[in-house]
Amino acid sequence: MQNTKLIIVFTLLALALTACGGAPVALPSTYPDAAVQVEVIALNHAPIRSAVEEVEALAAEYGEKVGYTRYDFDTDVGVAFAEKYGIDGHTPIAIYINGEDEFEIDGVATKFYSFPQDGGTGIVASGTWTMDDLRTVLDQ
């Protein structure tokens, strides 16, 4: 019985580390001298990780034209970044392009905050942006 409890505890611990783990998120800019800088701050766990990876891949398509920096809310650097922009609470992801997170796209104010459209969870709602919106801003 005691061994069974230990196995259960270690299994739950391993699952928790897998869900919240991954690479530490506080990466330096890919191209710090690029005219366009994309800064992403996100929670480093499963529900949002795929959106962060999509943003990272999109920024990489622009090569040296776009710098990309990623911050983790759970690091000192991430906390400082969040404080700089007044982000608090349970924010899955916020994206800043040259220090701005809201842009007008086709006459509509679009804020790169929270999950992309249709990407939310039962706990956190989707945002109002799409990857196509992000591409539109980066193309300008």
Language-model features: where?
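Non-catalytic, surface beta->alpha helical segment in thiol-disulfide oxidoreductase systems
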Residues: 97-140
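Thiol-based oxidoreductase modules, predominantly thioredoxin-like and allied folds used
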Residues: 64-78
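Bacterial signal peptide processing site
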Residues: 21-23
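Bacterial N-terminal signal peptides that target proteins for export
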Residues: 1-8
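Local sequence-structure signature of Cys/Sec-based thiol-disulfide redox active-site neighborhoods
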Residues: 27-62
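C-terminal motif of bacterial Sec signal peptides marking the signal peptidase cleavage site
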Residues: 15-19
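Structural alpha/beta surface segment adjacent to cysteine/selenocysteine redox centers
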Residues: 79-109
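Second-shell loop/turn segments in exported
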Residues: 40-46, 69-70, 81, 118-128
